[in-house]
Amino acid sequence: MNYLNENIDSLNKKLQDGEITAEDLAKETVKNIKETDKKINAWITVDEEAKPAENLDFNKNKLAGIPIAIKDNIITNGMKTTAASHILYNYMPVYDATVISKLKKAQATFVGKTNMDEFAMGSSTEHSYYGETHNPWNLDKVPGGSSGGSAAAVASGEVVAALGSDTGGSIRQPAAFNGIFGIKPTYGRVSRWGLIAFGSSLDQIGVMSKRVKDSAEVLNVIAGPDEHDATVSEQEVPDYTSFLGQDVKGLRVAVPKEYMDAVDGEMREVIQKQIDVLKDAGAIINEVSLPHTKYVVPTYYIVASSEASSNLQRYDGIRYGYRAKDTKNLLDVYVKSRSEGFGDEVKRRIMLGSFALSAGAYDEFFKKAAQVRTLICRDFEKIFEENDVIVGPTTTEPAFGIGEEISDPIKMYNNDLLTISANLAGIPAASVPAGLVDGMPAGLQIMAKRFDEGNVFKVADFIERNNKFYEKTPTGMED
């Protein structure tokens, strides 16, 4: 079964009516993945024996029997988890991430693990030990990253929803590139227990789907407290679907000058059109400034790389993962295992982070980056004193060609310009399809104050109802 024209509600109805069984749905999903993925490469692991939970309750659990894709940096008991790295090529977890446990309780079906940039470090899903993923809209283009596999799996109709992780835009940028919806919740809204760490003060698990409501349904399940994660919030989780179907009259919408100045031509026209739709519906549009936007890329890459260099120290070739052969002593095991096990981009960021944390550079780099991060947070706090949401482009350009930017790390890093501020500030942010630019999807980014995912869903759903982008079929999937 291909899900290009399906959603969680439609599948739930078919399951309730007996039009299809959960067992057949799992089998058909795997069959479709094996056919479709020959040209997409969205998956690292596909469970060909995928089975639904027992005693399914389709009335109580909207996700019962629904196949969900899982990014391969989220721990799954008994299913290989590699983070798209050679160093974890044979890692078989013995426990589930909290989000997986919650989805199991909701009786969702797991069909496999999706491709990604190694350890979530990248913006194109080209930095994977298992090969690059292709964009379903144009197979010669990247799907974005690092959650490019999850995005491509949804956009190509292999699944209706997928989990991703977002450290600097890794859900929102691929969502924009693939013409789907993707949301990064507030830092602490969803447990990170069982998420392979990249930047621990930035990482957040989120959801990707073709329809806004599908992400709301999944976030309803995975959000909330967790005894295993000290950073997760105890705040009550609202029913995110209750924010759908509302109008935006009177909603105060901020549009950052710096974000609009970062785009031009057709991209600017597409984004402005969606802003005008909100204005015509009665939203109050306010031009604002995020003055520290010019510092977000260096700030982010210092903070994220520093945290990564610390988190990745655990991969030493001793406890688990790849161990180099023909080593002479313990130090040789460490050096060779890490040199051979990590890819170039991961090693680049480890070196950058190790330097920023070194005694001679700490005050000059990491400490200053932390201070600028505080200023960035204050910029957002000031705007949210008089505005409900912030909107603007998700990316500065549509998807670029495979191989075009992989040899230019600085150009690749600058792709994150418009998304990383939300991670530095810890606020919820999403990307919803806005239209096409040069035949490729472009996304409208929506941000709100901490724990106000409701307004993000409200605006995204309004945009979706207006432009009905979900009715479009990716051109790379047309026969």
From Swiss-Prot:
GO terms for cellular component: glutamyl-tRNA(Gln) amidotransferase complex. The keyword Nucleotide-binding applies. Keywords: ATP-binding, Ligase, Nucleotide-binding, Protein biosynthesis. One of its GO terms (molecular function) is glutaminyl-tRNA synthase (glutamine-hydrolyzing) activity. GO terms for biological process: translation. InterPro entries: Amidase, Amidase_CS, Amidase_dom, AS_sf, GatA. The active site is at K71 (charge relay system), S146 (charge relay system), S170 (acyl-ester intermediate). It catalyses: L-glutamyl-tRNA(Gln) + L-glutamine + ATP + H2O = L-glutaminyl-tRNA(Gln) + L-glutamate + ADP + phosphate + H(+). It comes from the Bacteria. Its EC number is 6.3.5.7. Allows the formation of correctly charged Gln-tRNA(Gln) through the transamidation of misacylated Glu-tRNA(Gln) in organisms which lack glutaminyl-tRNA synthetase. The reaction takes place in the presence of glutamine and ATP through an activated gamma-phospho-Glu-tRNA(Gln). Heterotrimer of A, B and C subunits. PANTHER family: GLUTAMYL-TRNA(GLN) AMIDOTRANSFERASE SUBUNIT A (PTHR11895:SF151), TRANSAMIDASE (PTHR11895). Belongs to the amidase family. GatA subfamily. This is Glutamyl-tRNA(Gln) amidotransferase subunit A.
